[in-house]
Amino acid sequence: MTDKRAVRRAMRARRMALAECERAQAAQDVAGRILAWPVYRAARTVFAYVAARGEVDLGPVLCDVLASGRTLLLPRCEADGAMTARRVQTLDELAPGTWGLDEPGPDAPVCAPGRIDLALVPGVAFGRDGVRVGQGGGYYDRYLPGLRGVAAGVGYDFQIVDGLQASAHDVPVAFVVTPGGIIRCGQE
Protein backbone atom coordinates (compact mmCIF):
# COMPACT_ATOMS: atom_id res chain seq x y z
CA MET A 1 0.00 0.00 0.00
CA THR A 2 2.08 2.94 -1.24
CA ASP A 3 -0.47 5.36 -2.73
CA LYS A 4 -0.80 8.12 -0.11
CA ARG A 5 -4.51 8.68 -0.76
CA ALA A 6 -5.24 4.99 -0.26
CA VAL A 7 -3.04 4.89 2.85
CA ARG A 8 -4.81 7.92 4.32
CA ARG A 9 -8.25 6.46 3.61
CA ALA A 10 -7.38 3.05 5.09
CA MET A 11 -5.61 4.37 8.18
CA ARG A 12 -8.26 6.98 8.98
CA ALA A 13 -10.98 4.33 8.74
CA ARG A 14 -9.02 1.96 10.95
CA ARG A 15 -8.37 4.67 13.56
CA MET A 16 -12.02 5.68 13.67
CA ALA A 17 -13.10 2.02 13.97
CA LEU A 18 -11.21 1.59 17.25
CA ALA A 19 -13.36 1.16 20.33
CA GLU A 20 -12.99 3.87 22.96
CA CYS A 21 -11.37 1.36 25.33
CA GLU A 22 -8.78 0.50 22.65
CA ARG A 23 -7.97 4.18 22.14
CA ALA A 24 -7.66 4.73 25.88
CA GLN A 25 -5.34 1.73 26.31
CA ALA A 26 -3.18 2.86 23.38
CA ALA A 27 -2.96 6.38 24.81
CA GLN A 28 -1.94 4.98 28.19
CA ASP A 29 0.71 2.72 26.63
CA VAL A 30 2.13 5.49 24.43
CA ALA A 31 2.21 7.95 27.34
CA GLY A 32 4.06 5.40 29.47
CA ARG A 33 6.66 4.91 26.76
CA ILE A 34 7.16 8.63 26.20
CA LEU A 35 7.31 9.52 29.91
CA ALA A 36 10.04 6.91 30.50
CA TRP A 37 11.98 7.74 27.31
CA PRO A 38 15.38 9.40 27.97
CA VAL A 39 14.91 11.69 24.95
CA TYR A 40 11.69 13.03 26.46
CA ARG A 41 13.11 13.26 29.97
CA ALA A 42 16.03 15.38 28.71
CA ALA A 43 13.83 17.72 26.62
CA ARG A 44 13.21 21.18 28.07
CA THR A 45 10.97 22.37 25.22
CA VAL A 46 8.39 19.92 23.85
CA PHE A 47 6.24 20.52 20.78
CA ALA A 48 3.24 18.18 20.79
CA TYR A 49 -0.35 18.08 19.53
CA VAL A 50 -3.89 17.82 20.83
CA ALA A 51 -5.46 14.62 19.50
CA ALA A 52 -8.23 14.84 16.91
CA ARG A 53 -9.94 12.43 14.52
CA GLY A 54 -8.87 9.29 16.38
CA GLU A 55 -5.20 10.23 16.86
CA VAL A 56 -3.35 8.87 19.88
CA ASP A 57 -4.23 11.13 22.81
CA LEU A 58 -1.15 12.68 24.42
CA GLY A 59 -3.08 14.25 27.31
CA PRO A 60 -0.95 12.67 30.07
CA VAL A 61 2.24 13.79 28.31
CA LEU A 62 0.97 17.35 27.86
CA CYS A 63 0.07 17.49 31.56
CA ASP A 64 3.48 16.11 32.55
CA VAL A 65 5.33 18.74 30.51
CA LEU A 66 3.33 21.49 32.21
CA ALA A 67 3.58 19.97 35.70
CA SER A 68 7.36 19.59 35.40
CA GLY A 69 7.85 23.27 34.57
CA ARG A 70 9.07 22.64 31.05
CA THR A 71 7.92 24.52 27.97
CA LEU A 72 4.90 23.05 26.16
CA LEU A 73 4.30 24.15 22.59
CA LEU A 74 1.22 23.28 20.56
CA PRO A 75 0.52 23.93 16.87
CA ARG A 76 -1.57 26.79 15.56
CA CYS A 77 -2.61 26.95 11.90
CA GLU A 78 -2.26 30.54 10.74
CA ALA A 79 -4.38 32.35 8.14
CA ASP A 80 -1.46 32.36 5.68
CA GLY A 81 -1.30 28.54 5.66
CA ALA A 82 1.72 28.31 7.94
CA MET A 83 1.86 26.44 11.22
CA THR A 84 3.45 27.98 14.30
CA ALA A 85 4.44 26.44 17.63
CA ARG A 86 2.87 28.45 20.44
CA ARG A 87 3.61 28.23 24.14
CA VAL A 88 0.78 27.34 26.48
CA GLN A 89 0.74 27.53 30.27
CA THR A 90 -2.48 25.52 30.64
CA LEU A 91 -4.66 23.42 28.36
CA ASP A 92 -7.60 25.65 29.30
CA GLU A 93 -6.14 28.28 26.91
CA LEU A 94 -7.05 26.19 23.86
CA ALA A 95 -9.98 26.97 21.57
CA PRO A 96 -11.15 25.64 18.18
CA GLY A 97 -9.05 27.11 15.39
CA THR A 98 -8.91 27.15 11.60
CA TRP A 99 -9.73 23.46 11.11
CA GLY A 100 -11.92 23.12 14.20
CA LEU A 101 -8.97 21.70 16.14
CA ASP A 102 -8.15 22.87 19.65
CA GLU A 103 -5.16 25.19 19.43
CA PRO A 104 -3.51 28.12 21.24
CA GLY A 105 -4.89 31.59 20.68
CA PRO A 106 -3.29 34.22 18.43
CA ASP A 107 -1.68 35.97 21.41
CA ALA A 108 0.16 32.89 22.69
CA PRO A 109 3.95 33.34 22.36
CA VAL A 110 5.53 31.85 19.22
CA CYS A 111 8.61 29.66 19.56
CA ALA A 112 11.02 29.12 16.66
CA PRO A 113 11.51 25.49 15.57
CA GLY A 114 15.22 25.79 16.31
CA ARG A 115 14.43 26.06 20.04
CA ILE A 116 12.47 22.79 20.23
CA ASP A 117 14.15 19.78 21.84
CA LEU A 118 11.47 17.20 21.03
CA ALA A 119 8.59 17.32 18.55
CA LEU A 120 5.87 14.69 19.01
CA VAL A 121 4.26 14.59 15.58
CA PRO A 122 0.92 13.07 14.57
CA GLY A 123 0.56 11.19 11.33
CA VAL A 124 -1.72 8.90 9.38
CA ALA A 125 1.04 6.35 8.67
CA PHE A 126 4.76 5.90 9.29
CA GLY A 127 7.48 3.81 7.72
CA ARG A 128 10.27 2.19 9.71
CA ASP A 129 12.62 4.34 7.65
CA GLY A 130 11.03 7.53 9.02
CA VAL A 131 8.65 8.31 6.15
CA ARG A 132 5.59 10.07 7.54
CA VAL A 133 2.24 10.42 5.81
CA GLY A 134 0.27 13.28 7.35
CA GLN A 135 -3.23 14.59 6.77
CA GLY A 136 -2.22 16.03 3.40
CA GLY A 137 -1.94 19.74 4.20
CA GLY A 138 1.86 19.78 4.41
CA TYR A 139 1.90 21.79 7.65
CA TYR A 140 4.49 19.60 9.41
CA ASP A 141 6.53 19.12 6.23
CA ARG A 142 6.90 22.91 6.00
CA TYR A 143 7.58 23.33 9.72
CA LEU A 144 9.96 20.48 10.60
CA PRO A 145 12.96 21.43 8.42
CA GLY A 146 13.83 24.18 10.92
CA LEU A 147 13.74 21.79 13.88
CA ARG A 148 17.06 21.32 15.68
CA GLY A 149 15.75 18.70 18.10
CA VAL A 150 14.29 15.23 17.64
CA ALA A 151 11.12 14.60 15.62
CA ALA A 152 9.16 11.55 16.77
CA GLY A 153 5.99 10.34 15.10
CA VAL A 154 3.19 9.09 17.34
CA GLY A 155 0.63 6.52 16.25
CA TYR A 156 -0.95 3.11 16.72
CA ASP A 157 0.95 -0.08 15.92
CA PHE A 158 -1.12 -0.61 12.76
CA GLN A 159 0.02 2.78 11.45
CA ILE A 160 3.48 1.35 10.75
CA VAL A 161 3.24 0.60 7.04
CA ASP A 162 5.87 -1.04 4.84
CA GLY A 163 6.60 0.40 1.40
CA LEU A 164 5.60 4.02 1.97
CA GLN A 165 7.05 6.27 -0.70
CA ALA A 166 8.42 9.65 0.31
CA SER A 167 7.77 12.69 -1.85
CA ALA A 168 10.46 15.32 -2.33
CA HIS A 169 8.83 17.61 0.26
CA ASP A 170 8.28 14.92 2.93
CA VAL A 171 10.30 15.39 6.12
CA PRO A 172 11.14 12.14 7.92
CA VAL A 173 10.91 11.49 11.65
CA ALA A 174 13.79 9.99 13.64
CA PHE A 175 11.56 7.81 15.84
CA VAL A 176 8.01 6.48 15.90
CA VAL A 177 6.29 5.87 19.24
CA THR A 178 3.45 3.33 19.30
CA PRO A 179 1.82 1.29 22.07
CA GLY A 180 4.17 -1.55 21.10
CA GLY A 181 7.41 0.38 21.44
CA ILE A 182 9.70 3.13 20.24
CA ILE A 183 11.14 2.54 16.79
CA ARG A 184 14.42 4.23 15.89
CA CYS A 185 13.82 4.87 12.21
CA GLY A 186 16.28 3.42 9.75
CA GLN A 187 17.72 1.11 12.41
CA GLU A 188 15.62 -2.00 11.80
Regions found by a protein language model. Give the residues of each.
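N-terminal active-site beta-alpha-beta segment that forms phosphate/nucleotide-binding
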Residues: 1-115
